[in-house]
Amino acid sequence: MADLSQQSKARVEALRREINHHNYQYYVLDQPTITDAQYDQLMQELLRLEERHPELVTPDSPTQRVGGQVQRGFSSVPHKIPMLSLGNAFGEGDLREFDRRVRSYLPGEEVKYVVELKIDGLAISLWYEKGLLVRGATRGDGELGEDITINLKTIRAIPLRLTQEVPFLEVRGEAYMPKDSFVRLNEAREEAGEPLFANPRNAAAGSLRQLDPKITAARNLSVFMYAIGYIEGAKPPSHAESLAWLKELGIRINPDHQVCGSIDEVIDFISQWQAKRYQLPYAIDGMVIKVNSLEQQQRLGTTMKSPRWAIAYKFPAEQAVSTIKDIIIRVGRTGVLTPTAILEPVQLAGTTVSKATLHNEDIIRQKDIRIGDKALVQKAGDIIPEIVQVYPEKRTGNEVPFILPVTCPECGAEVVRVAGEAAHRCTNENCSAKSREGIIHFVSRSAMDIMGLGEGIVNQLIKGGLVKDPADLYDLKYEDLIRQERMGARSSQKLLAAIEASKNNSLGQLLFGLGIRHVGERAAKILARQFGSMQALMQATAEDLTGISEIGPRIAESIMEYFSRQENQGLIERLSKAGVNMLEEVEQTESTDQTLSGKTFVVTGTLEGFSRQEAQRAIEERGGKVSGSVSKKTNYVVVGENPGSKHDKARQLGITILTEQDFVKLLQQQ
């Protein structure tokens, strides 16, 4: 037993080193060397070993990122050195004045600056003791911040242990939400009738102040760290060298910074980034300029509010005035009615803008938006066009107040507003708009990725009665497509090939494509990898679901409700019969013998060495099948602690009952 325990300990330590190495490759170097599936395999193996040997669990284990308990609140914690805000510069003149002040304090000395991107997020502080992450906090008022350690640990870009055992290090940076995650989050909130986040910064701040860390974990946040706040021991001599050292420690820094020898170089570098800021996958609202020499920083010192050795250059907000030509309603795949303003086209943030979402009736009323109004338009977080305000003083008397329809503009059914939600919804489950938007979502790039099946052809197929739901797509024939507008022989053949190819997509893609409320792309992948098959997910209990990291009660309830409906069960059955993949393939270094091929298992009770999902995965990897109920077709019932009625039924039917020890032996058979 001692040898076995030592082997487990050695394997756990090796797995942690390997997982941390891959985190460093992915988040710090941006050079991943393994697939997501291979990474998940390593994590699952580590989880299994730690469940069997809880004495081996350590605070810095990659498995400890998402805590299970909901917090009651956040306590205040002091910063060792105040987290001061920066003074602002709004033009070239302000930058040159900053340079003049710096040089007046350092007469005759060479001054170099480091210029960095100003990430539009939430300022955070991380404490490491002997290389281990022990605390994470917000900036707060600069003197006191909020302890949000449990939420910051869910961000995979933050290392739980550094590559070197530094006695004490406080490092400061910015937590942010990528643009694509912000768009998906707001789309999901809009469909759910929840208030929208105004920009990625607010979304990041709101996500980090969640009392339930599972919600934070599902929000796909990231970080860039940009400075040493406090350190026990010697600092590198310059800010640029500090950034390089932080990177060596495994801390993620932004690579797009530059050392400049003059204020002219600073201004040139800022101009370059002002022109290409919209190409970034995250929002920036300016640039930060710092004196490079830490010794010079020390002599320059600070005022009561901000350091003398740094300044933030703020990009001007890109806004434009347009006319609201009309307000139209779009019905989404969950029945939400979303008003959209049709605008006179204007140039904004590098694109032509002709539409702006108005989100819901409340926002239209709050801003008193009318058809015909002159409106100030900007892009929220440089992404989504929005109306900031209208100009009542410019009204001519011909403007028309907008009234949300009481019936669905697509099907004529009653529209209701659910208590506690901002959204109005169509009450018709068979609304044609819901079907259309559901199919468009199903074929989208992040879901089943069926190239060539755009909104136009989907509308034609629906109008022609050929397609009512996603399963109908797999019944389409060449003759059906060639008759559609703008569909020639070649495009019809290519589309049929794309539909056929989509049958081999991952289970995660299919789950996301089904459009289950609150189940985003990330949650779909997690569910697919955890359960391994559609059948297993459909049989999952609420307890099974909420026991998964990043799956909270709201998602669990939505999944249970979706699979309880007969029409959805029928849709999945038809997709399966059409040949659509219902399994999540796991990449394995060695092929597993199919020793359980054709055998049906039921697992009941609590197993010591396996979670329910792990036991199921082990059976399915060997060719077996797992059922949620005992019948005459069941071959084995695996019994853990507190098994319940399934154990009794198995005895009555004379089915072979396996203890956990028996089950392990069966799995080990060659």
Swiss-Prot record:
SUPFAM superfamilies: BRCT domain, DNA ligase/mRNA capping enzyme, catalytic domain, Nucleic acid-binding proteins, RuvA domain 2-like
Binding residue positions for NAD(+): D36, A37, Q38, Y39, D40, S85, L86, E116, R139, E174, K290, K314
Keywords: DNA damage, DNA repair, DNA replication, Ligase, Magnesium, Manganese, Metal-binding, NAD, Zinc
Domain (BRCT) ranges: 591-670
Described purpose of this protein according to its UniProt entry: DNA ligase that catalyzes the formation of phosphodiester linkages between 5'-phosphoryl and 3'-hydroxyl groups in double-stranded DNA using NAD as a coenzyme and as the energy source for the reaction. It is essential for DNA replication and repair of damaged DNA.
PANTHER family: CHROMOSOME TRANSMISSION FIDELITY FACTOR 18, DNA LIGASE
The name this protein goes by in its record: DNA ligase
The species this protein was found in: Desulforamulus reducens (strain ATCC BAA-1160 / DSM 100696 / MI-1) (Desulfotomaculum reducens)
